Amino acid sequence: MAYYTVGTIVNTHGIKGEVRVVATTDFPESRFAVGSTLYAFQKDQATPVTLTVASVRQHKNFYLLSFEGKPSINDVEIFKQSTLKVTDNELESNDLRPGEYYYHQIVGLDAVTVDGENLGKIKEILSPGANDVWVVARPGKSDLLLPKIDQVIKRVDLDQGKVIVELMEGLD
């Protein structure tokens, strides 16, 4: 089963079992909804702890969550600095608009030019500012940085496992 990070518990809040969560998901409303299942990965623990969201509210830049069966600060203190994740079963395709993809769908795809030249595999995605940048590992060469703009990324074909790109002058 694959897990995907949606947030980090940074501290407790009050004495009634609430935790402060910094969201790292684009969909906090659905990921942290009451009744949602989250998996807390603690440092030095091999298996995650399964948690069900009992309440959620936004406070400043945090989400304050409480979990079923964890009514006091003593119950949740152990989760400080835990990473909250969801399984691939919780990822919903209707969260995405046409032309949007989850990072894990893009990483590992082959980058191929419109002329059919294989450039390498996409190894990571950077988010430095206005546009994401897809990093292509090229054998025997330095990494190629592709901005996620329509002029460069022409088509994503998940079934074929490739991304069709048109290199602008200066990218190679």
Swiss-Prot record:
Where does the protein principally reside? cytoplasm
Sorted keywords for this record are: Chaperone, Cytoplasm, Ribosome biogenesis, rRNA processing
Supply one GO CC term from the record: cytoplasm
* Gene Ontology biological process terms, A to Z: ribosomal small subunit biogenesis; rRNA processing
Gene Ontology molecular function, alphabetical: ribosome binding
Query: Among its keywords, does the record have Cytoplasm?
Result: yes
Subcellular location(s) of the protein: Cytoplasm
Q: Signal peptide location in the record?
A: none
Top-rank lineage group of the source organism:
Bacteria
Q: Which InterPro entries match?
A: PRC-brl_dom, PRC_barrel-like_sf, RimM, RimM_N, RimM_N_sf, Transl_B-barrel_sf
**Residue stretches making up the PRC barrel domain:** 98-171
- What's the subunit arrangement here? Binds ribosomal protein uS19.
Q: What is known of its domains?
A: The PRC barrel domain binds ribosomal protein uS19.
Q: Which family does it belong to?
A: Belongs to the RimM family.
Function, as annotated, reads: An accessory protein needed during the final step in the assembly of 30S ribosomal subunit, possibly for assembly of the head region. Essential for efficient processing of 16S rRNA. May be needed both before and after RbfA during the maturation of 16S rRNA. It has affinity for free ribosomal 30S subunits but not for 70S ribosomes.
What is the protein's name according to its record? Ribosome maturation factor RimM
Q: Which organism is it from?
A: Levilactobacillus brevis (strain ATCC 367 / BCRC 12310 / CIP 105137 / JCM 1170 / LMG 11437 / NCIMB 947 / NCTC 947) (Lactobacillus brevis)
Its taxonomic path starts at:
Bacteria, Bacillati, Bacillota, Bacilli, Lactobacillales
